[in-house]
Amino acid sequence: PTRRSSDLYVASVKTFGLKREDFLAIVDGMEMDVPQDIRAPDLATLDLYCDRVASAVGRLSVRVFGLPEDDGIQLAHHLGRALQLTNILRDIDEDAGLGRLYLPREWLWHAGITNNDPARVTADRALPKVCAPLAERAKMHFQKSDEIMERNSRRAVRAPRIMSKYYRAILDLLIARGFAAPRAPVRVSKAAKIGILLRYAII
């Protein structure tokens, strides 16, 4: 990094009280994908991955937004996991093409899927039995994050609320489509995107 970027980093850390461990968690999350492709992690590892690649970013962001410490940490916890689980459900086939499978091992076994080859898992007829409870877990995290945002100022939660509404729309489309193969990609319509921005960013 240049001297100026380093100075800006130090100034931001001091101004907003950003935590060094959150920056390191983000790096750790990226490194989880590097040494070997993730395939059917256990639930604890999946949750750790979600924390590192999503919630850690949230913990840094909420301090900049000006949320109270406790609510900010809880919002980062729940919204980060909601967004990342939605990403996992949306990108099942794309990830499989890269040799990755983020669906939890315990739930695959419970559904009778013992193979961890991404291509075979994503074609398995029992896959919806794994994806449906994961979608419910994402919905729970969305609900918890909504409760936190409701009790904080509209200005402080503007950015996280927009992200929440957009990703919740994706999750709803995924649930409506279902998770059996073949899975058509889902996209939030332009009208829906504009509606979210008008309601939560402008009005």
Map each language-model feature to its residues.
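Catalytic cores of Mg2+-dependent Asp-rich isoprenoid enzymes
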Residues: 3-84, 89, 93-203
